[in-house]
Amino acid sequence: MKNFAGVAKHLDTTGEALQQAYATALQANPQLSRGQFLKACVLERNLKPKKPAVTTQAILDGLASGKTVDQTLESLGLTGSEAQAADSAAQSQVTLYAQEA
């Protein structure tokens, strides 16, 4: 719960709501890690204003189909270098936010 609370503050939600959303996503994809889920949420927040197709659900669907985050972002309209940069930035943000709880 601790790392959900830290990330939740930056996503305008609660740790409980984020944890419940993760539990729901985990039912759809039992292989999904907490880190992948949190990164998908941060990616939506970072990218959706300019790339409306980038949603948490679209990223989770890509992961469930066996794609990497980068591959999923590319399929949603980002270039390879944009996808790598966005993935790396989101990972750094999740790591930082999780420590704030």
PLM regions: where:
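Mature extracellular/secreted ectodomains of secretory-pathway proteins
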Residues: 1-101
